[in-house]
């Protein structure tokens, strides 16, 4: 499974408006990924929205990334957001899909999102340690 975290910096008090646009963009017939979650920061860097999408393969992730970047209206929020970053991740082989289900154990409205870097040539040793 492949994942993308989009981080948008928004002007104060535009989060609800942006969330509606994100929902519409990600549920459009031409959308190629699955919207897994949308969060707003209230600790750390404020006025950011994080959008988590999942993809079954890298080709669909790349196609959806292209759709997101084309036209200057990413997530339907082109007139709202001040900055946008798109980060892609591939799940480790032992990971269950990241989506709120009984199987994954994910539930509730509050999540802590962390990212970690891995040294060059460190992916396989990390997998082996797990």
Model-derived features: positions:
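Surface-exposed beta-strand edges and their flanking turn/coil or helix-capping segments
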Residues: 18-21, 50-53, 64-66, 99-104, ...
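A generic short-segment signal for beta-strand/edge and adjacent turn/coil regions
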Residues: 7, 17-24, 57-59, 80-85
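Short amphipathic alpha-helical segments
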Residues: 14-35, 66-77, 122-130
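Surface-exposed interaction/gating patches
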Residues: 2-11, 92-130
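Generic "edge-of-domain/loop-turn" microfeature
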Residues: 15, 45, 57-60, 93, ...
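Glycine-rich beta-strand-turn "strand-cap" elements at beta-sheet edges
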Residues: 9, 27, 34-50, 72-109
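Short, well-ordered beta-strand segments in beta-rich or mixed alpha/beta enzyme
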Residues: 2-9, 37-67, 108-117
């Amino acid at each position: 499974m492949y994942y993308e975290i989009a981080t948008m910096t928004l002007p104060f008090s535009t989060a609800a408006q942006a969330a509606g646009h994100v929902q519409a963009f990600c549920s459009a017939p031409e959308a190629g990924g699955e919207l897994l979650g949308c969060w707003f920061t209230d600790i750390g860097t404020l006025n950011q929205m994080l959008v988590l999408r999942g993809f079954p393969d890298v080709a669909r992730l790349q196609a959806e990334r292209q759709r997101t970047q084309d036209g200057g209206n990413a997530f339907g929020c082109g007139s709202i957001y001040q900055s946008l970053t798109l980060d892609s991740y591939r799940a480790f082989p032992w990971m269950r899909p990241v989506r709120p289900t009984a199987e994954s154990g994910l539930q509730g409205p509050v999540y802590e999102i962390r990212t970690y870097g891995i040294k060059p040539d460190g992916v396989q040793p990390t997998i082996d340690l797990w």
